[in-house]
Swiss-Prot record:
It comes from Homo sapiens. SUPFAM superfamilies: Ankyrin repeat. InterPro entries: Ankyrin_rpt (IPR002110), Ankyrin_rpt-contain_sf (IPR036770), P-loop_NTPase (IPR027417). This is IQ motif and ankyrin repeat domain-containing protein 1. Keywords: ANK repeat, Coiled coil, Repeat. Pfam families: Ank (PF00023). PROSITE patterns: ANK_REP_REGION, ANK_REPEAT, IQ. The keyword Coiled coil applies. Residues 1-72 are annotated as: Disordered. ANK repeats lie at residues 191-223, 224-253. Residues 62-91 form the IQ domain. The keyword Coiled coil applies. Residues 281-398 form a coiled coil.
Length: 560
């Protein structure tokens, strides 16, 4: 067996010795067996040839060099591509951030400007009140001291002030100047004493005569009922008593304690003058004063009728400006809706990685420019309307209109709206319309536990979204807030809400979850449901003020 096995083995060895070439080829054909020795023999066979004639490396060295070059080139391309994409992202963020900053800063600047104007108006009103009080004190002191020059100086200041206010010297201007002089002559101190009464108490006949010429009444009463004649007789000023009697002072007028000027007179000469005075002269003077008062009343009535005629054209102007303002707000509302659609299209293109982002971004820029232009036009229209209303109020001489509804500050909104302290809202029966030109009320309500709906964005005004907001507010007993901003969007919201005529349980659908089952609508939570409307328009349309309860937000420390 061993010899048989040995013969093939020896034969194989002999075959390998006689034919070494096939063995090498056979060994090379077997994968993984003798390849490394063959590679080593190959390099050893090439070494003498390399030493004799140097050549470029071939085979695996070329592959490694090619891979290194390709790797370096790809890294370079990747770095450049990364830098390009970073630059594009930076430019995109800058392009998106700049409009966002401007959109955020624009209302802030408007709020600051509105607050500055309100503050300046309040400061001007306070300054005018202080100056008026100072003039009154100067007038009262000058009347008591008999300083006629100071009295004339105060009257001259008032005339100059009326001139600066634009009051002319025509019939209407003279009527207004006369009314101002009479009001200044009848001004009172904290005790109800007029300048004429102070002049009588000081015994100043010239000052008494001057005040009477300006229209002051010689029979005015101060605290506890003393007349100027009473005070002059009590002080023993004979000349002042005589002048007052000639001007129509009635010696029969009693004070609150029942005493007459004759009883409190401190000098016998004053008593004798009062006793010997002819009362028929007093009656004649009283009739003349009554006739003068009637004449002034008739002049005031004629002046009022003339003002009403002039206000007719101004009323038409206010109506025209109101229509223009409503048209501007309507166009601005449409522009806001278009901007929201453009932003939604841009977001969808980015999410789907489409190559139309540049087009959508340019469309957003164009729409934002249109919104800014329409916003400025609406602001100008609102300012023109406010000035026309102010001019109309000044012409009718009605002063500042008494704004209907409630007034509160931002810090009091929780008590007024959420708690309804005093049951003012419940007693009125209307839902509140919060009027806040600065927008602080909207920020306050947004961060409360409320369902906040931004009416400028058309998405929340869809029936499905509004239905969920209303149902959620009823289910969890939360206020539902509609922010109208600067636009007149109340009719749009009203149409959406009036479309829901059923009761809240009829709003439920089979697809709703268990949290909206009928058993979850508890009466205790439903009592906390509120409906609020917030607007930045200072003077909303009359229709809104009739349907809703106005709640005006004032600045801290002011009456505005």
């Amino acid at each position: 067996m061993d010899s048989k096995k040995g013969r093939p083995k020896a034969a194989a060895g002999k075959w390998q010795t006689l034919h070494p070439g096939p063995k090498t080829r056979a060994a090379a054909g077997k994968p993984g067996e003798n390849r490394p020795p063959q590679r080593k023999a190959g390099w050893q066979a090439r070494e003498p040839a390399s030493a004799e004639s140097p050549q470029a490396p071939t085979g695996p060295a070329e592959d490694r060099a090619a891979r290194a070059i390709q790797g370096a080139f790809r890294q370079l391309r990747a770095r450049r591509e990364l830098a390009r994409r970073r630059e594009e992202r930076r430019e995109y963020l800058e392009q998106m951030e700049t409009p966002q900053k401007e959109a955020y800063l624009a209302p802030v600047r408007r709020e600051q400007e509105a607050a500055r104007r309100l503050r300046e108006q309040e400061e001007a009103a306070q300054r005018e009140r202080r100056e008026e009080l100072q003039r009154r004190r100067r007038l009262l002191d000058a009347a008591f001291d008999g300083d006629v020059g100071e009295i004339r100086a105060v009257l001259k200041e008032v005339e100059q002030l009326l001139t600066r206010e634009g009051v002319g010297h025509d019939e209407a201007g003279e009527a207004r100047r006369l009314q101002r002089r009479v009001a200044l002559a009848e001004c009172e101190d904290s005790y109800g004493n007029t300048p004429l009464s102070e002049a009588a108490a000081g015994g100043q006949p010239l000052a008494i005569q001057l005040r009477a010429e300006l229209g002051a009444s010689p029979n005015s009463k101060g605290a506890f009922g003393p007349t100027p004649l009473y005070r002059a007789a009590f002080g023993g000023h004979l000349a002042a008593v005589e002048v007052l009697l000639k001007l129509g002072a009635d010696p029969r007028v009693y004070a609150e304690d029942g005493s007459t000027p004759e009883r409190v007179a401190s000098l016998d000469t004053v008593v004798s003058v009062l006793r010997s005075w002819d009362l028929s002269l007093t009656e004649a003077m009283l009739q003349n004063m009554e006739a003068e008062q009637q004449r002034r009343a008739q002049e005031a009535q004629r002046h009022k009728e003339a003002e009403a005629e002039r206000c007719g054209s101004m009323t038409l102007k206010v109506q025209q400006l109101t229509r223009e303002q409503q048209q501007c707000h309507k166009e601005l509302q449409q522009a806001y809706c278009e901007l929201s659609r453009r932003i939604s299209e841009h977001d969808q293109c980015e999410w789907r990685c489409m190559d139309k982002t540049k087009l959508t971004l340019q469309a957003i820029k164009d729409t934002e420019a249109q919104v800014d232009r329409l916003r400025q036009e609406a602001q100008k229209a609102e300012e023109a309307l406010a000035m026309a209303r102010l001019e109309l109020r000044e012409q009718t001489q009605e002063g500042e209109e008494e704004a209907p509804g409630l007034k509160c500050q931002v810090t009091e909104l929780h008590d007024v709206l959420m708690k309804d302290v005093g049951n003012r809202i419940r007693a009125d029966g209307r839902w509140p319309l919060v009027i806040d030109p600065l927008g602080q009320a909207a920020t306050f309500l947004r961060y409360q536990d409320t369902n906040y709906v931004d009416t400028v964005n058309p998405e929340p005004l869809r029936p499905e979204t509004m239905w969920l907001a209303l149902l959620g507010a009823l289910r969890y007993g939360k206020p539902l807030v509609f922010d109208l901003r600067e636009e007149d969007l109340f009719p749009v919201v009203q149409r959406q809400l009036e479309a829901v005529q059923e009761r809240y349980l009829s709003l439920l659908r089979p697809t709703d979850g268990p949290e909206y089952s009928p058993t979850q609508f508890q009466e205790q939570r439903l009592e906390h449901f509120r409906l609020f409307f917030v607007t930045k328009v200072q003077w909303p349309p009359a229709e809104q003020l009739q349907v809703l309860l106005p709640v005006r937000v004032q600045l801290p420390g002011t009456g505005l």
